[in-house]
Amino acid sequence: MCTNVVRVFVILYLLAECGCIKYDVDDNVHICTHTVMSHINYTSWYYNDKVIALATEDKTSGYISSFIKRVNISLTCLNISSLRYEDSGTYKGVSHLKDGVIVTTTMNISVKANIIDLTGRVRYLTRNYCEVKIRCEITSFALNGSTPPHMILGTVDKWKYLPFPTDDYRYVGELKRYISGNPYPTESLALEISSTFNRFTIVKNLNDDEFSCYLFSQNYSFHKTLNVRNICESEWEALNNNDNASSVPASHNNLTNDLSSMTSQLQNDDNDYSTPMNVDNLIMIVVITMLSIILVIIVVIAAIAIYKRSKYSRHTDN
C-alpha cells in the first residue's frame, strides 16, 4: 500500500512539473498585461525567449512568419487564434513604462495534441489466459525550446518511467532497442510493457485494466489511456465464435443423418404393414369364417350322432 502511494505521488509530481496552462488545438488565447496602455512606452513580446514582435504606440513590427495570420499584438496584449500544437511554449511580454519601470508578463502554454500512439497487441492467447504487449510511442514531437520529454507507461501498480536526454538515447526499430551515444529522433521514442490477464478473474479494480501513457516536459503534457482487458475480451469472443462456427457443420450433418434415419425407419415401418382392406372384403372373410366354423360344428355333431347310432345298433343285435 505504501509503495502504491509513493508511486502516485511520483507521477503527480512529475506531471506537475509542466506548470503550464493547457489548451486544445484551435483554441484562442489572450496574454495581457494589467498595465494601463497610456503608461507604456513600448512592449517587447517573446516566444521561448526569442523576440517575436515589438509594439509601440504607433505600430507593431517584427512578426515571425508562423504568427502573421493568427496573431494580434498590441502594447498590452498578445492574442493567438486557432492554436496549433507547435504554438506550445513560454510567452513573455516586457513592457517599458514611460516612468522607466519595466513590467513583465509571462504565460506557459501547452497545446494538447495527438502525438502519442498507445496500442496493445496480443502475444499469447488461450481460452483462459491472454498476454498483451502495450506500447506507447511518440509519433511527433518538437522541442520548441522545451526541456527533453519524460514518459510514464503503465498502471498505478505496474509502470515504467523513462527520461529522454537529447544526447543519450535513441530507439532503433530494426534493433528493437534503445542505443546511446547519438541524438535521437524524438518521433521514434517508445516504451513497452507486457501484462497477462486471466479470463475468469473477477475484476475488483478497473484501474488494474487501464494502462496510461504520460508524456511531459517543461511546456508539454500529453496523456492517453487504453483498457487492455477489452482487447483480450475481444480476442476471447472471436475464439469462441470460431469454435462455434467449426462445430456447426458437424451438428448439421448429425441432424441430417438423424432425419434420414427417421425417414428410412418410417418407410420400413410402412413396408411391414399390408395395404388396408376395404369393408366388403372384411365382411366376406368374417362370413366365410363363421360358416366354416358352423360347418365344422355340424360335421362334428353328425359324426357323434352316427357313432352313437352305430353303437346302439350293435347293442340291439346282440
Swiss-Prot record:
Induction: Expressed in the early phase of the viral replicative cycle. Glycans are attached at residues 41, 72, 79, 108, 144, 219, 244, 254. It is a single-pass membrane protein. The keyword Zinc does not apply. Its main location: host cell. The chain crosses the membrane at residues 282-302. It is found in: Host cell membrane. One of its GO terms (biological process) is viral process. GO terms for cellular component: host cell plasma membrane; membrane. The keyword Signal applies. Belongs to the orthopoxvirus OPG049 family. Plays a role in the spread of virus to neighboring cells ex vivo. This is Protein OPG049. It comes from Monkeypox virus. The gene is OPG049.
